UniProtKB/Swiss-Prot annotation:
SUPFAM superfamilies: UDP-Glycosyltransferase/glycogen phosphorylase. UDP-alpha-D-glucose binds at residues 301, 358-360, 375-383, 397-400. Belongs to the UDP-glycosyltransferase family. InterPro entries: UDP_glucos_trans, UDP_glycos_trans_CS. Expressed in roots, shoots and leaves. GO terms for molecular function: glucuronosyltransferase activity; UDP-glucosyltransferase activity. It comes from the Eukaryota. Keywords: Glycosyltransferase, Transferase. Its EC number is 2.4.1.-. Gene3D superfamilies: Glycogen Phosphorylase B. This is UDP-glycosyltransferase 85A5.
Length: 479
């Protein structure tokens, strides 16, 4: 790999390619911005579908980029559509795995024959876009895989093949979910229900089960793997991963680096990749509220629920008599438009704000926010920990179950709500979160993690700062 070392006077050129979902695109954009700030020429690659969605949500010039920060797109292999919804995840995973390598190689060839653009010297791709490894090896450049889940989620994925070997997956029936899992190094007191949800496959042909076995196995070929977490949060789990794949680095929380290193008003700071318009009025509303008084509710970019579950959450929140900011995506209710009961809207009129999307990192670091009702996606969990905000967790799929387990038992910052959603339980847990003794203890614990997250990203000495610099120097620049 020595051949890729960047010659003096030549700008290093990184191609960043996220998996085409909001929760993967956002952290990859942060990595791209940090590399740009360190002198890299950046090409950021979306799928055509998401490229078009971003232009619709952010305006026709939103992906014009900068002279050294360019946007490109490749097809995802699925029929062309112009919708503003998240694509079906299994279909998308299967398609990217089978169809994206050829257009990606063609894009690299085109970039490398473009005048006045430095040749591609390295690739940073999503952990589940491992087809890029074939292109990188052909080109003789390093490929760093960015696995966007928690370290505990990633370690579980690395062991998916063992679940199949042990006959634990595909599962026989729901009762299997209580099976104790005590053989993953450094992961204690787990049940099968706490393992990423794709393990719940009911047949050997299941797309997601096979996809993660395939992607986790290929991870070992990466020049390095980066994780958006920090050592003190997941120390033992990270060491267990490193015993399987030594070249693993924790470089998070990424949003703390970006907030520190990138001026929000600068050209690079202005570049965004949210597929829904962020309603900044949320922050003005929070400014009118007293500290720790508001419940923030957001189930992320993929979670869907039934109309009945939406109504139960609504009346549970109403019964707490707390102020709340609730993000309700247009596609939150499966196959329908989310409809809140008129009585609920009247009753809560003076103590709520509803939005279809919001600037979440700013919300979770706002002093008015005292608790977070979340789906336990990793970006949300990390932003909540970094803001010192405790959580009520309603995990939906993927490694959200694992994150929820760790939030509740290991990090002591969360309480889990039942999957069926009853308004009485919503009320009880949210009241405990905001006013109860357990809620106070969880807030203290969250504030401890906040301090440790800030330490990890400290200039010069922070563990994540040192790791990020090492990945840049040793791997991406090949020094």
């Amino acid at each position: 790999m020595a051949s890729h070392a960047v010659t003096s006077g030549q700008k290093p050129h990184v191609v960043c390619i996220p998996f085409p979902a909001q929760g993967h695109i956002n952290p990859m954009l942060k990595v791209a911005k940090l590399l740009y700030a360190r002198g890299f020429h950046v090409t950021f690659v979306n799928t055509n579908y998401n490229h078009n969605r971003l232009i619709r949500s952010r305006g026709p010039n939103s992906l014009d980029g900068l002279p050294s920060f360019r946007f490109e797109s490749i097809p995802d292999g699925l029929p062309e559509e112009n919708k503003d919804v998240m694509q079906d995840v299994p279909t998308l995973c299967e398609s990217t795995m089978k169809n994206c390598l050829a257009p990606f190689k063609e894009l690299l060839r085109r970039i490398n024959t473009t005048k006045d653009v430095p040749p591609v010297s390295c690739i940073v791709s999503d952990g589940v876009m491992s087809f890029t490894l074939d292109a990188a090896e052909e080109l003789g450049v390093p490929d760093v895989l960015f696995w966007t889940p928690s370290a505990c989620g990633f370690l579980a994925y690395l062991h998916f093949y063992r679940f199949i070997e042990k006959g634990l997956s595909p599962i026989k029936d729901e009762s299997s979910l209580d099976t104790k899992i005590n053989w993953i190094p450094s992961m204690k007191n787990l049940g099968l229900k706490d393992i990423p949800s794709f393990i719940r496959a009911t047949n050997t042909e299941d797309i997601m089960l096979n996809f993660f076995v395939h992607e986790a196995d290929r991870a070992k070929r990466a020049s390095a793997i980066i994780l958006n977490t920090f050592d003190s949060l997941e120390h033992d789990v990270v060491r267990s991963i490193q015993s399987i794949i030594p070249q693993v680095y924790t470089i998070g929380p990424l949003h703390l680096f970006v907030n520190r290193d990138i001026d929000e008003e600068s050209d690079i700071g202005q570049i965004g990749t949210n597929m829904w318009r962020e309603e900044m009025e949320c922050l003005d509303w929070l400014d009118t509220k007293s500290p720790n008084s508001v419940v923030y509710v957001n189930f992320g970019s993929i979670t869907v629920m039934s109309a009945k579950q939406l109504v139960e959450f609504a009346w549970g929140l109403a019964a707490t008599k707390k102020d709340f900011l609730w993000v309700i995506r247009p596609d939150l209710v499966a196959g329908d438009v989310p409809m809140l009961p008129p009585d609920f809207l009247i009753e809560t009129a003076n103590r709520r704000m509803l939005a279809s999307w919001c600037p979440q990192e700013k919300v979770l670091s706002h002093p008015a926010v005292g608790g977070f009702l979340t789906h336990s996606g990793w970006n949300s969990t990390l932003e909540s920990l970094s803001g010192g905000v405790p959580m009520v967790c309603w995990p939906f799929f993927a490694e959200q179950q694992t994150n929820c387990k760790y939030c509740c038992d290991e990090w002591e910052v969360g309480m889990e709500i039942g999957g069926d959603v009853r308004r009485e339980e919503v009320e009880e847990l949210v009241r405990e979160l905001m006013d109860g003794d357990k809620g106070k203890k969880m807030r203290q614990k969250a504030e401890e993690w906040q301090r440790l997250a800030e330490e990890a990203t400290k200039p010069i000495y922070g563990s994540s700062e040192l790791n990020f610099q090492m990945v840049v120097d040793k791997v991406l620049l090949g020094e």
